[in-house]
């Protein structure tokens, strides 16, 4: 192939899942599965970077940003000096322009797909786990995973990150938080328990520095103002072309950190969330407010510094209908 290929178009339309495309500078793009393409730059001792997008099919801006980077790599306009794996994750949902078809894929990682083997999303989540594990098994330096999203609602902090729960004495890395700050990330949630998300899987089982990045509001293809994504676009391009570049130190006073305090679990269809449908992520919860109720179960705000994250009373019983978070600090060095 001599012209610059469209990676996204190939991912969405082609049944050729084992194609290999020669690229400028001796690079090659190798399709490992539908929507999953690996590009090896100067791989000697290089970082291994996984960029995933489209886990929710209607979150299109990250898809456009990543496809733009791939297009520039293919045209020889962006140098690649790391191992790169890109996943356009939920192809069916991307084609349909919906968040998901049958089940939220970002609740099916960490082996949760085994509980719903009949679902197409489960089959895909298992495939993505396998490919990610194989990719990171070949890593010789840093293992980095950024799972790119946009949110279904507005947010007090437009761009924020979720740092998955860390086991076995692992600590939050200031240099990664500093890099996120450089991207334009305005707040970070330090998760306090395991989750069935893609970034938790790669963090725990691949020992990657992994993050879920929420980068703005979900909009259809063609309706995104990509200038609002210039921070993450520029930072990722810098990472791919010059992964060893110095990053300014973390300014903790300018990057609010939060920890998950507890989940709002929807136990039954009687669950009632006492927040407006339009409530934004990270909205402050007044002290004493009855946040939600579900029969005899009551969730009440305390202290006046708690905030709501990902409120969604429409989830199925047994699932999380929101997270209550509170301010956090990193341990002293």
UniProtKB/Swiss-Prot annotation:
Pathway annotation: Amino-acid degradation; L-arginine degradation via AST pathway; L-glutamate and succinate from L-arginine: step 5/5
Name listed for the protein in its UniProt record: Succinylglutamate desuccinylase
Record's catalysed reaction(s): N-succinyl-L-glutamate + H2O = L-glutamate + succinate
Lineage: Bacteria, Pseudomonadati, Pseudomonadota, Betaproteobacteria, Neisseriales
GO biological processes: arginine catabolic process to glutamate; arginine catabolic process to succinate
Cofactor binding note of this UniProt entry: Binds 1 zinc ion per subunit.
Encoding gene, per UniProt annotation: astE
Enzyme class of the recorded protein, top EC level: hydrolase
Entry function: Transforms N(2)-succinylglutamate into succinate and glutamate.
Cofactor needs: Zn(2+)
Recorded GO MF terms: hydrolase activity, acting on ester bonds; succinylglutamate desuccinylase activity; zinc ion binding
A Pfam family of this chain: AstE_AspA_cat
Superkingdom assignment: Bacteria
Catalytic site positions: 214
Entry EC no(s): 3.5.1.96
Positions bound to Zn(2+): 56, 59, 149
Keywords: Arginine metabolism, Hydrolase, Metal-binding, Zinc
Protein family according to the UniProt entry: Belongs to the AspA/AstE family. Succinylglutamate desuccinylase subfamily.
């Amino acid at each position: 192939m001599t012209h610059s290929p469209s990676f996204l178009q190939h991912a969405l339309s082609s049944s050729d899942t084992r194609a290999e495309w020669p690229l400028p500078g001796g690079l090659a793009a190798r399709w490992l599965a539908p929507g999953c393409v690996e590009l090896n730059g100067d791989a000697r001792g290089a970082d291994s970077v996984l960029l995933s997008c489209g886990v929710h099919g209607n979150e299109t801006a990250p898809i456009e940003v990543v496809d733009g980077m791939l297009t520039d790599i293919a045209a020889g306009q962006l140098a690649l000096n790391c191992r790169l794996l890109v996943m356009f994750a939920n192809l069916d949902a991307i084609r349909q322009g919906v968040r998901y078809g049958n089940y939220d894929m970002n609740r099916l990682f960490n082996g949760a797909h085994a509980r719903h083997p009949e679902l197409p999303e489960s089959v895909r989540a298992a495939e993505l786990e396998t490919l990610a594990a194989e990719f990171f098994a070949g890593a010789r330096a840093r293992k980095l995973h950024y799972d790119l999203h946009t949110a279904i609602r507005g947010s007090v902090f437009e761009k924020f990150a979720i740092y998955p729960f860390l086991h076995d004495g692992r600590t939050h890395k200031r240099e990664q938080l500093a890099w996120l700050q450089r991207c334009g990330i305005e707040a970070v949630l330090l998760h306090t328990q395991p989750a069935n998300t893609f970034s938790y899987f790669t963090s725990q089982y691949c020992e990657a520095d992994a993050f879920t990045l929420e980068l703005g509001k979900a909009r259809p293809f063609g309706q995104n103002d990509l200038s609002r994504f210039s921070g993450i676009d520029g930072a990722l391009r810098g990472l791919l072309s010059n992964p060893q570049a110095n990053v300014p130190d973390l300014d903790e006073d300018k990057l609010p950190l939060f920890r998950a305090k507890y989940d709002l679990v929807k136990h039954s269809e009687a669950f009632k969330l006492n927040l407006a449908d339009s409530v934004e992520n990270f909205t402050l919860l007044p002290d004493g407010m009855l946040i939600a109720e579900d029969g005899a179960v009551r969730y009440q705000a305390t202290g006046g510094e708690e905030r709501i994250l990902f409120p969604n009373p429409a989830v199925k019983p047994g699932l999380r209908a929101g997270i209550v978070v509170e301010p956090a600090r990193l341990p002293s060095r």
